[in-house]
Amino acid sequence: MRTALVTGAGRGIGRAIALRLAKDGFRVIVHYAGNEAAAAEVVGLIGEHAVAVRADLGVPGDVTRLAERVAAETDVLDVLVNNAGIGMSKPLAEETEAAYDRVFAVNVKGLFFLTQQVLPLIPDGGRIVNITSGVARIAFPEGIAYAMTKGAVQVFTLALAKELGPRGITVNNVAPGIIDTDVNAAWLNDPQARAYAAGRHALNRIGRTDEIANVVAFAASPEASFVTGTTIDATGGGNL
């Protein structure tokens, strides 16, 4: 049985990815940062072929502990999905150094070093999928630091795809648009805000978590064997 690690898999997009990969026959390592109950629920839905592991990717030492736990769970990691991340919505003038450091620690540094430390487990022909965002290709002054982190990950993906290409390991980004998640519920529950958000997509609606999971499942599949170093835009035609 193939094994996948999905970070930030307790809720939202990560949860949907974990459930979809399990449906596709993967044993799933469900990473979570703090919500143990949510991660346990995902494991319960998957059954015996899932295990939950906790780590705060922004805390020194936690990435190493996570990588060690993954190595204890499996000798081979067929798919790594770097989904965990935190969002920010502040313009330049209102940003603080502490908040800036935190979002880069989780979204960039944690992702970078987790990938580095589990890479020895990834076999030739393996898959790495990084979840970025549609804001990496537009001007997003409302959340400039967050957008910068997603741009950094996309550059990381390019370099890693070239480095790992000779081993047949593909590395790709999946960039969601505005998705109906519990994190976004606070503002998407406002009808006016929801209509505005939907209008920013060519499809004139908000995306679903399962739609992003479907794209990730493709990127993680044998059918995507000749796709690497690219960003798959899953924004529903956002900001065209």
Describe the function of each predicted region.
Residues 138, 217, 228-240:
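Short C-terminal tail/terminal secondary-structure segment
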Residues 115, 149, 157:
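Active-site helix of classical SDR
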Residues 201-212, 223:
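A conserved structural motif in NAD(P)-dependent oxidoreductases
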Residues 120-121, 162-166, 225:
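Alpha-helical segment proximal to the catalytic Tyr-Lys
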Residues 133:
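Residue(s) in the substrate-gating loop at a strand-loop-helix junction
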Residues 91-92, 96-101, 197:
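Substrate-binding pocket helix/loop in short-chain dehydrogenase/reductase
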Residues 10-11:
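Conserved glycine-rich cofactor-binding loop
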